Amino acid sequence: MRHLLYATRQTYETAILIKEAALLPSEIERNYIDPITISGYSKENLIVFTLDYQPNNKAPVGHCKAYLLGQLLPALKKLGTKFIYCADSNYFKVLTKNTKAEAQLGYVLPCAIDGYTDMKVILGVNYQALTYNPNQADKLNLSIGTLTSQLSGQYKALGSDIIKWASYPKTEAEIEKAFAEIMTWDEIAVDTETFSLHPLKAGLGTIAFSKDITGGFGFQCDLIQQEGENVRIFNTMFRHRLRKFFEEYNGKVIWHRAAYDLKVMIYNLYMADPLDNAGLLEGLEVFTKNLDDTLLIAYLATNSTAGNELGLKTLAHEFAGHWAKDDISNILAIPLPELLQYNVVDTMSTMYVKNKYYPIMVRDGQKRIYQEQFLPSLKTIIQIELSGLPLIPDKVKEARKELENGMFAAIQLMRGTKFVKAAERVIQQRAMEAANAKLKTKQHPIEHFSHMQLNPGSNQQVAILLYEVMKLPIIERTKTKQPSAAADTIDKLIYHAKTQESKALLQALIDYNKVAKILSSFIPAFEAAFDKGNGRAYLHGNFNLGGTLSGRLSSSDPNLQNLPSGSKFGKLVKKCFAAPHGWIFAGADFNALEDRINALLTQDPNKIKVFTDGYDPHSMRTYAYWPEKFKHLPNTVEGINRIQEEFKTERSDSKPVSFALQYLGTWMTLVKNCGFSPEESKRIEDNFHKLYEVSGKWVKGKIEQATKDGYGTGAFGLRIRTPLLAKSVLGSSKTLREAEAEGRSLGNAISGQSYGLLTNRAVNEFMQRVWASKFRNDIIPVALIHDAIYVLIRNNPAAVKFANDNLIECMAWKGLPEIADPRVPLPANLDLYWPNWATPITLENNLSEDEIKQAVTAALEARKAA
């Protein structure tokens, strides 16, 4: 237990606790002692102690308790310590018996350990965290401010006095008077409390409005109190008044995570039923005419390789504190006055977040992308998420049954191998030893454990199979340094298998993992889809703006970006999706968008050749990686493209190589992911960099520029902050490993990934055309997955032609200077999925209505003949 003193005395009123690795006197003084003493507190009252960690750099609860009770707390008691600044979340949670440390930042808590409850504990921040994430500086300053306010006797709990005024109108007259006042405000923050996270089940419990950070109005809607309990009702009068207000109000309306609240508002105030697209569009126009979304503002102000937190409570914590003990999951269980106050604090906090982050967004040049890309995308996404993806419930049942059969078959195949039988003997032996270790005399024989079989879902048991029995190399480890048995690790290990039996076993494990993922992540969501009474149930997932570093959409509930595709499992899942009667499910996917964008950005001649000269890209790379194998082939388009048919194995082997190296992997990645020897891996990496020398220099230059600027720039000017690169000299022996990883993340984002925003831009322009056309209720967007746009089109040749002409034209847009080179276009084709998503009919561009009919007829006849 090491310590630092600033005077020799009998007592020290305040102790700072920190990991031993951070006990650097100059840094302790700069980050803690100096800021504390500036407030007038004498540093002679301060002492710094180290916190003990295990050799593996872990501090589990038991270890923390033993160190605190055995050494540290008795020492602090003897020194008369009253205040503890604990710059370690693990120890803080033990000291205060809190399960979540972050929420307690800015608060003074009593020590919860018996015998030491007279001590006060403040959660601190380890200054070393600032190296990896400069945003932690705000939290460090907040924690120091909390300590100094406590030491000076001026401490007030965060959020305890932020409400300067609040009003909760109940009568019709009070409600009218309140709305009349709100109507005079130039801008308002609005927030709802609802009964469910599902937009079609949420209802409107309460709603609040604020014009600034001092207070606001809170209104009951579909929630009343009867005999002391909350009761859900349908408040027609208030809903009518609410709709009237939003139609008449012309000021700025500010939401946090508007995609959710606006879905709820539109569905409840405008849609007569779940299929009412006309009502949806009417409400969409009202609610998107003049809005801000503080989640998007905060994202653009903080987007960084260090990550960011975009929840309202986190962003406004320094203002409002931990104003709700937990996220509200059931508003019926919360006293109505408390719920209304909570709702008002939400709107005040929304205003606080805008006031803090909007100027940063503008300063960093992100206002244009916010207004021209993110807000239009928000409007489109609201219609997408309210419309949903149509599913056939009976097909979902069939898929579950087939998947369960596939899982059973994979398990049976595994259990028939010598490797699994050997692994089961190890599992049984260890179970016997563990059981017998608890017994004093009687011992269980191994036969008592013969029923135990390998559980493919147990990482611990699969690790025994992979590494102890099959003797496969350990290519990845878990956070606890154990050999990894994760699904993506097994995907790589198959390249290290030496025999057909071991490869077959690993393939069965891969199949098992894929099926298990579908059964756990997708099928339950499909089964819970919303039945709209037209023969289809609809999947209402989330497409999240601001969910990735590159600006591309993420997806959740479920993550549709992870839908299996291109395999037997992908086809099985896609059979579940089909349009309702009278409609066509359709989609258009950019053709190799990321590869085309990379060629355009880098102007690498060997990447551009693929699109100008007709090279098969996989054959070109195969030829470059293993030139010794193809000396007999002429170095021409025709010669190299022969690899596509004549050397399918080598071409297939090139794909994981290309994937690894295109995303800035190294020869070591190839050893791990592909099973090549170090020597071969080095040759392949060298050949890759020779092939793509120009693009390699381009990416390197962008990363080096980020070390000077502290950020890189993606599509449409998206800023990607790189705090570690800003402090690093790349390529030196002292370069942080994390800085190199940050460089890879930046390189991947700016060299292609961020241009996934072109998908957003295309669908936004397309929907503007649809909304302005006679087809506004005949073409409905339903999903954005990777670089593909999915829509429902009424079964009408004119509507199909409109989509085929306009969507493809919008996707072909190349209005950014860096991608304007006409040699590499951005093509796409419209697919009509009939009878379901698994069976596309691809249309050529610019077909007439008659040609569309002929193309569909020909495709269906070809299927019959096949």
Where are these regions (language model features)?
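Short hydrophobic beta-strand that contains or immediately precedes a catalytic carboxylate
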Residues: 16-18, 124, 188-190, 291-292, ...
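Acidic beta-strand-to-loop metal/phosphate-binding motif
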Residues: 82-89, 189, 251-261, 585-587
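A polyanion-binding, active-site-adjacent surface
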Residues: 1-157
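Active-site-proximal helix-loop-helix substrate-binding element of RNase H-like nuclease domains
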Residues: 119-120, 128-133, 141, 151-170, ...
